Curated annotation (Swiss-Prot):
One Gene Ontology cellular component annotation held by this UniProt entry: viral envelope
Gene3D superfamilies: 3.90.20.10, 3.90.209.20
Protein name, UniProt field: Hemagglutinin
PTM comment: Palmitoylated. In natural infection, inactive HA is matured into HA1 and HA2 outside the cell by one or more trypsin-like, arginine-specific endoprotease secreted by the bronchial epithelial cells. One identified protease that may be involved in this process is secreted in lungs by club cells.
GO BP field: clathrin-dependent endocytosis of virus by host cell; fusion of virus membrane with host endosome membrane; fusion of virus membrane with host plasma membrane; virion attachment to host cell
Keywords: Clathrin- and caveolin-independent endocytosis of virus by host, Clathrin-mediated endocytosis of virus by host, Disulfide bond, Fusion of virus membrane with host endosomal membrane, Fusion of virus membrane with host membrane, Glycoprotein, Hemagglutinin, Host cell membrane, Host membrane, Host-virus interaction, Lipoprotein, Membrane, Palmitate, Transmembrane, Transmembrane helix, Viral attachment to host cell, Viral envelope protein, Viral penetration into host cytoplasm, Virion, Virus endocytosis by host, Virus entry into host cell
Cytoplasmic compartment spans: 536-550
Similarity-based family: Belongs to the influenza viruses hemagglutinin family.
Assembly, per entry: Homotrimer of disulfide-linked HA1-HA2.
Length: 550
């Protein structure tokens, strides 16, 4: 089409931004679904299916629970003096010694797990007047009867069981964990056969605490040929404190102490295999990468892990608003500005220029505005990770049956925390996405304003992101506009002259329409005047008569 001014004496310059055929939908504060050119998934929703043994030291419990390894169950002797960052308990773990219970099982398990060691120091307890090293067929060590290796079962010597009173000071500079127990015979006959007295008792004291346990004699369900039970207790002795043990029967005595350590070791129930690999974050499902700020694999974690949320997906915008390129783009064919649509195929930048002049058409990216936008977006993912990643482990919570209400409260608190973090994650990502879209739009507007200030009166804003340049602007001229060296004074006279000529032609073309409309209006007015005059003349002559009735 041969339009006025669309010749070699003018040029068209359009500004635009990158676009893709199929963008990604993200959520912002103002819009639940807005399309962007690129986005990054923030929720880790799958695990590797295996537990990595690096950088954390993983100890596979195999068929032993941590408490069985602590007590010295014969089939758990391989764990003596072991250390770990994470002790992995398996679902097929079992006890293979005298049946026992731990009244405060969860606390003992947690205490030992966090210590990260089963280092045991034997001490010289003196038990006078009793028989030591009792055993049971329920706890065989090889072909012989045995017992827990870390405990000493004391029974009568001959026909006597004297009152025992033993003290053991802690002269070291660390806490000591003593494990001891009380035997509950199944019958009164068994009680007197083992301990002489019809009713024994055990008292274990320190300066800070005291525990007195009276045996509960009675038959219980048979386990490994035994209807009696042993209750396991524990006492922590601080540096400078003293352990005091008093008993007149039924005592399962300690052989020494476990050296307590402070740290961030833990325990986890999992059947995932352990493999040689590297991962900072471990869940019961297996290790997961920690390069995302959120995960919905498992609530239980160990290591530096993403925060657990309920959402399956949260996408962080890492590109600009996507406006796919239209197939038809107006009078200039391939030339259209950012207000109409984006440009597909821009591989060297996010923002750029397209031009049409006497030498043809061309395209080039604007690296300055592109880099400015990228610099602001690049740090977003790392900042979100820093705000949300756990630098500690979320341990399993266990409570005994009598602590059911505490367990319910704990579950409510944990669920509330997850709800809050899920909501916070949603808002945080929406805010970041809103900021990304706003800043990328802002860079586009900055580039447009910078170009407009350069061209001044030498060009006219066409309203679609393009400028009509009213002077001859070859490729060198176009390049000067792009790199900011354009001198509008050089082209000012030519641009003004061409602008007046083009506007003049447009003005003359417009006058024809005005003249036609004015002529038509005057003709209609004159016709009405003549017709009205004829009617009045006829009325005066009597040729026309008008009757007006009310």
């Amino acid at each position: 089409q041969d339009l006025p001014g669309n010749d070699y004496s003018t040029a068209t310059l359009c500004l635009g931004h990158h676009a893709v055929p199929n963008g990604t939908l993200v959520k912002t504060i103002t819009d639940d679904q807005i399309e962007v050119t690129n986005a990054t998934e923030l929720v880790q929703s799958s695990s590797t299916g295996k537990i990595c043994n690096n950088p954390h030291r993983i100890l596979d419990g195999r068929d032993c629970t941590l408490i069985d390894a602590l007590l010295g169950d014969p089939h758990c002797d391989v764990f003596q003096d072991e250390t770990w960052d994470l002790f992995v308990e398996r679902s097929n773990a079992f006890s293979n010694c005298y049946p026992y219970d731990v009244p405060d099982y969860a606390s003992l398990r947690s205490l030992v797990a966090s210590s990260g060691t089963l280092e045991f120091i034997t001490e010289g307890f003196t038990w006078t007047g009793v028989t030591q090293n009792g055993g049971s067929n329920a706890c065989k060590r090889g072909p012989n009867s045995g017992f827990f290796s870390r405990l000493n079962w004391l029974t009568k010597s001959g026909s006597t069981y004297p009152v025992l009173n033993v003290t053991m000071p802690n002269n070291d500079n660390f806490d000591k964990l003593y494990i001891w127990g009380v035997h509950h015979p199944s019958t009164n006959q068994e009680q007197t056969n083992l301990y002489v007295q019809a009713s024994g008792g055990v008292t274990v004291s320190t300066r800070r605490s005291q525990q007195t346990i009276i045996p509960n004699i009675g038959s219980r369900p048979w386990v490994r040929g035994q209807s009696g039970r042993i209750s396991i207790y524990w006492t922590v002795v601080k540096p400078g404190d003293v352990l005091v043990i008093n008993s007149n029967g039924n005592l399962i005595a300690p052989r020494g102490y476990f050296k307590m350590r402070t740290g961030k070791s833990s325990i986890m129930r999992s059947d995932a295999p352990i493999d040689t690999c590297i991962s900072e974050c471990i869940t019961p499902n297996g290790s997961i990468p920690n390069d995302k700020p959120f995960q919905n694999v498992n609530k239980i974690t160990y290591g530096a892990c993403p925060k657990y949320v309920k959402q399956n997906t949260l996408k962080l915008a890492t590109g600009m608003r996507n406006v796919p390129e239209k197939q038809t783009r107006g009078l200039f064919g391939a030339i259209a500005g950012f207000i109409e649509n984006g440009w597909e195929g821009m591989i060297d930048g996010w923002y750029g220029f397209r031009h049409q002049n006497s030498e043809g058409t061309g395209q080039a990216a604007d690296l300055k505005s592109t880099q400015a936008a990228i610099d602001q977006i690049n740090g977003k993912l790392n900042r979100v990770i820093e705000k949300t990643n756990e630098k500690f482990h979320q341990i399993e919570k266990e409570f005994s049956e009598v602590e059911g209400r505490i367990q319910d409260l704990e579950k409510y608190v944990e669920d509330t925390k997850i709800d809050l973090w899920s909501y916070n994650a949603d808002v945080l990502v929406a805010l970041e996405n809103q900021h990304t879209i706003d800043l990328t739009d802002s860079e586009m507007n900055k580039l447009f304003e910078r170009t407009r200030r350069q061209l001044r009166e030498n060009a006219e804003d066409m309203g679609n992101g393009c400028f009509k340049i009213y002077h001859k602007c070859d490729n060198v001229c176009i390049e000067s506009i792009r790199n900011g060296t354009y001198d509008h004074d050089v082209y000012r006279d030519e641009a003004l002259n061409n602008r007046f000529q083009i506007k003049g032609v447009e003005l003359k073309s417009g006058y024809k329409d005005w003249i036609l409309w004015i002529s038509f209006a005057i003709s209609c007015f004159l016709l009405c005047v003549v017709l009205l005059g004829f009617i009045m003349w006829a009325c005066q002559r009597g040729n026309i008569r008008c009757n007006i009735c009310i």
